């Protein structure tokens, strides 16, 4: 049987599952109809008990839940909803063990799935330093996991647009976290330059270099590591690989008419190993039909993977 994986930043699970009116029924109603077998959730912003309470109707219908809350209450938090029990569950990465930003487990079929919530950052603040530190810790783990788990998908809110095509108004966002040169260079190092032959020119002269709170000296530990596009990547942006020029946006600010005007950002990704990319059949975003029907500022990103022959 095929395996469908969804990834979505729920923007607070208690708010996402709230029924607002007879038309806006929230995430629980979406779970009743989704084709997903696994839902990778980010920004859960709840304790384990609160998350189980919010999702109780879905759990009663057979969904199983694992969560990794952030130590700081009301912040971050990741979770995995699955129709099958997970084994070999792991939370956190070095330096961010209790930050509620990474959770992985293996399905009975052998596919390993992970939910990632990368720090959002904020240019010229300590939050951007935190984001760069996370990237530095995360990058070597990607190489380890690709070798250890040939069939693995890391879905989540990466909080970075890789290419100009990944946001509506790229020219006005060149100095904002989520589209800074070091962030985009990180994505190049993970996914390569596809579909371009070479990486896009990301060293905008008005915004090149460091954008954290502290200007580090060359070679200092805090300086974002120089990165180049991977010639032979171990991870693949599934949506972009399946739709080289048309991968849709996944996030729209609540401000103004961004949703109605489709002024969005593509910051949610499913990163797959080569074996999983070979199984990927189709990818799509389930965008709400109207702004008042949204239960998060993100929309679910889904990918259907063909049967891999596991038990």
Predicted regions and their residues:
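Short hydrophobic/aromatic beta-strand or adjacent loop that forms the aromatic wall/cage
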Residues: 76-78, 99-104, 266-268, 296-302
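Active-site beta-strand/loop signature of hydrolases that rely on acidic residues for catalysis
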Residues: 5-10, 30-50, 113, 142-164, ...
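Active-site environment of divalent metal-dependent phosphoester hydrolases
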Residues: 15-16, 46-50, 124, 161-162, ...
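Surface polyanion/phosphate-binding segment centered on an Asp-His-Pro turn
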Residues: 284-311
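N-terminal, active-site-proximal structural segment of metallo-dependent hydrolase catalytic domains
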Residues: 1-57, 72-75, 205, 307-311
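Structured beta-strand-rich core segments of catalytic domains in phosphoester-bond hydrolases
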Residues: 44-123
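Metal-dependent phosphoesterases centered on the DNase I-like endonuclease/exonuclease/phosphatase
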Residues: 61, 136-267
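Conserved beta strand-loop-helix elements of the APE1-like EEP
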Residues: 73-89, 260-279, 305-306
